[in-house]
């Protein structure tokens, strides 16, 4: 209940959680707030310098995580990866000023096995980092957005969801009733823009867009793509929905999940 602020020193995370065990942030009374500032090279929530940030679960509350120089907002510190991060509720902001992902890897770190199933999430990558995924030169993979309202913005040259500068993005799934907004990072110097979903930019080349798996995206879910530097409250450049329509059943209840056999095609056996 109430509000708590954690502010760390050099090479340490605001709320430090390195490789061992797990960390759960919960708010049963729905009125708690946590702000965590990482010191230089430390994540807001996750790893200190040279450390990974893994097995982090946020189920509720107002959480604001600000990574220090070269570290993620939520995830790895400098040279650390962010993995097994799950957000299922709450209002979560995750930002970094330079070279780290909003949620995922610190500078030179990857972001993987990241799941968002609910809540309001705003992830902003630092310069050359992804909003959700890899930090500077890091890849972003196995990222699932299955619910909630999610906004992911890459820093300069970073993908909205996927890789940081020079990093790849792959294994990205958007499903359920997810409301997702993505924006790749802008050109910086001779380095190209980041993809909305996909890879980060590289020298003279824009990041490659990757088509996410939307087979299990419900008719109420959508992905909105915004241009670099554009306002994410305006009209998107592109909106993606699942071409599958609503299902009408004559009787009974579907108890076995569908198998996705193609874009917009679900098979029940």
Enumerate the predicted regions with their spans.
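A composition-driven surface/loop motif
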Residues: 1-248
